[in-house]
């Protein structure tokens, strides 16, 4: 009874038989079980191993790289633990949600379909306390001016 083996094993055996003594057969790419190459001769092309029509898995978006950049601007010699980074990321997400919610309320109240920098500025004044709000507004105004001038 003939031995039924997967096609990949047959190719390796045939390559080993045909090579002259002293030369090693070319190593073939091994794929995980159940996977096949998207093109013949191992070329993956533009799909990068994904099936046609399938979407790439979206990673979780965080503010970690931006927190780290600001930390290095302020204190270049200090690091941050992963737990502290996670807390900072949660803090920024929380503030963002509060400001977005307040801005949406303001836009709805004024019967406007769009949240503009004016709604954001007002929501910053409402959400953040005293001196922190003043500083945030001045930094935000500076950032918007820089953005519009470039």
From Swiss-Prot:
Keywords: Acetylation, Chromosome, DNA-binding, Isopeptide bond, Nucleosome core, Nucleus, Ubl conjugation. Residues 48-57 have a biased composition (Basic residues). It is found in: Nucleus; Chromosome. Residues 1-58 are annotated as: Disordered. Residues 1-17, 37-47 have a biased composition (Basic and acidic residues). GO terms for molecular function: DNA binding; protein heterodimerization activity; structural constituent of chromatin. InterPro entries: Histone-fold, Histone_H2A/H2B/H3, Histone_H2B, HISTONE_H2B_site. The modification N6-acetyllysine is found at residues 4, 29. The modification Blocked amino end (Pro) is found at residue 2. CDD domains: HFD_H2B. There is a cross-link at residue 146 (Glycyl lysine isopeptide (Lys-Gly) (interchain with G-Cter in ubiquitin)). It holds the Pfam family Histone. Gene3D superfamilies: Histone, subunit A. It comes from the Eukaryota. Can be acetylated to form H2BK6ac and H2BK33ac. One of its GO terms (cellular component) is nucleus. The nucleosome is a histone octamer containing two molecules each of H2A, H2B, H3 and H4 assembled in one H3-H4 heterotetramer and two H2A-H2B heterodimers. The octamer wraps approximately 147 bp of DNA. Core component of nucleosome. Nucleosomes wrap and compact DNA into chromatin, limiting DNA accessibility to the cellular machineries which require DNA as a template. Histones thereby play a central role in transcription regulation, DNA repair, DNA replication and chromosomal stability. DNA accessibility is regulated via a complex set of post-translational modifications of histones, also called histone code, and nucleosome remodeling. Belongs to the histone H2B family. Phosphorylation of H2B was not detected. This is Histone H2B.2. It comes from Triticum aestivum. The lineage of its organism: Eukaryota, Viridiplantae, Streptophyta, Embryophyta, Tracheophyta.
């Amino acid at each position: 009874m003939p031995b039924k083996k997967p096609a990949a094993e047959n190719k390796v055996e045939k390559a080993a038989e045909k090579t002259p003594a002293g030369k090693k057969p070319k190593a073939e790419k091994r794929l995980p079980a159940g996977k096949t190459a998207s093109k013949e001769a191992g070329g993956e092309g533009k799909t990068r191993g994904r099936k046609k029509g399938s979407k790439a898995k979206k990673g979780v978006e965080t503010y970690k790289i931006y927190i780290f950049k600001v930390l290095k601007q302020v204190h270049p010699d200090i690091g941050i633990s992963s737990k502290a980074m996670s807390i900072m990321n949660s803090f920024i997400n929380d503030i963002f949600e509060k400001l977005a919610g307040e801005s949406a309320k303001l836009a709805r109240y004024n019967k406007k379909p769009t949240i503009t920098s004016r709604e954001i500025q007002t929501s910053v004044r409402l959400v953040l306390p005293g001196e922190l709000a003043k500083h945030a507004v001045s930094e935000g105004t500076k950032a918007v001016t820089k953005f519009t001038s470039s």
